[in-house]
């Protein structure tokens, strides 16, 4: 049995942007499935992001520890579209979230022109939730920007425009400081890779990324430069509570997480939940075995990847929005006592 290590994957995907290639190159994905193996398909978001690495980790642990099943991972694209493909039966797993799944079930927002979305949602179940990771608002250590309130006139990478991360970061800034994107500060148009590169090159004042610490982007940045994470002067009040709603929650980013991190005290930010969806029609026994294979072998990950310590069974099986656990996953969570 191989020992799973993710440090090489994180470094590789930061430079190549290819998740599947990164996994194969580091030698941590199981070798090609034999003729009798069941090969399942997973799609996730940009491969350099922590959430994609979490999902690749899941696939890798299952493939390493469950005979007869291999999970192939492809990175890139939007989770909103991946969910539709799970519903159609073209994918077996994808990323999900309470908000996105609720919208898909109702045929609203990005799904308003997708007449089949509510019906397809019935073929999308939940395997587990995990923390998205606190949103990190990073500046260089010598920046005059000390808090989010100081961002007036700044150039910022919030995430790809129109995406969930962009809207989440924009909303947190506006609810805590009153600063409005496009009026009080500029948000550059870039994808994840070019947005990070803009920060490396000093072309933006603030770089935003939600991730479980330690994050590959900040590990890489602090190899050669110093940074600070910033938060709002005040993270309380009615506007903030309204913004957080049911699915987001305040989170703290500790000091001393990175060798070049110059914060003297923890910083307040926010977090949310994302999850791994699974095709409802995938048989219960298979999903049970997959769920069990991951959680029974999670120690293979946490020993080398400190961020994985944020994954826990209670969070994984919690009720969030309309998403229902796949019966196979629910069986495992009941066995270990986290689901009644």
What residue ranges belong to the model's regions?
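Bacterial N-terminal signal peptides that target proteins for export
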Residues: 1-23
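Ligand-binding pocket segment of bilobal, Venus flytrap-like solute-binding proteins
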Residues: 91-95, 184-246
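C-terminal lobe and pocket-closing loops
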Residues: 228-289, 332
């Amino acid at each position: 049995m191989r020992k799973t290590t993710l440090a090489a994957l994180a470094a590789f995907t930061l430079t190549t942007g290819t998740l599947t290639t990164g996994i194969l190159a580091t030698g941590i994905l199981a070798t090609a499935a034999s003729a009798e193996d069941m090969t399942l398909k997973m799609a996730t978001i940009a491969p350099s992001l922590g959430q994609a690495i979490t999902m690749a980790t899941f696939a890798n642990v299952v493939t390493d520890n469950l005979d007869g099943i291999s999970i192939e991972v492809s990175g890139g694209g939007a989770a909103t579209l991946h969910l539709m493909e799970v519903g159609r039966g073209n994918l077996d797993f994808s990323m999900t979230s309470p908000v996105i799944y609720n919208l898909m079930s109702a045929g609203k927002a990005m799904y308003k022109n997708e007449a089949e979305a509510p019906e397809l949602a019935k073929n999308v179940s939940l395997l587990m939730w995990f923390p998205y990771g606190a949103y990190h608002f990073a500046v260089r250590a010598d920046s005059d920007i000390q808090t989010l309130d100081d961002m007036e006139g700044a150039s910022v990478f919030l995430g790809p425009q129109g995406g969930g991360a962009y809207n989440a970061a924009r909303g947190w800034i506006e609810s805590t400081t009153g600063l409005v994107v496009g009026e009080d500060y500029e948000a550059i148009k870039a994808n994840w890779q070019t947005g990070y590169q803009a920060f490396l090159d000093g072309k933006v004042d603030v770089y935003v990324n939600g991730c479980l610490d330690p994050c590959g982007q900040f590990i890489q940045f602090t190899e050669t430069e110093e940074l600070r994470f910033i938060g709002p002067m005040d993270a309380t009040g009615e506007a903030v509570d309204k913004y957080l709603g049911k699915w987001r929650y305040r989170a703290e980013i500790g000091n001393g997480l990175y060798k070049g991190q110059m914060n003297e005290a923890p910083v307040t930010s926010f977090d949310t939940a994302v999850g791994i969806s699974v095709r409802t029609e995938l048989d219960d026994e298979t999903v049970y075995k997959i769920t069990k294979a991951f959680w029974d072998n999670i120690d293979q990950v946490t020993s080398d990847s400190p961020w994985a310590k944020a994954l826990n069974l209670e969070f994984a099986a919690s009720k969030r929005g309309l998403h229902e656990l796949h019966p196979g996953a629910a069986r495992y969570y009941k066995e270990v006592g986290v689901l009644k």
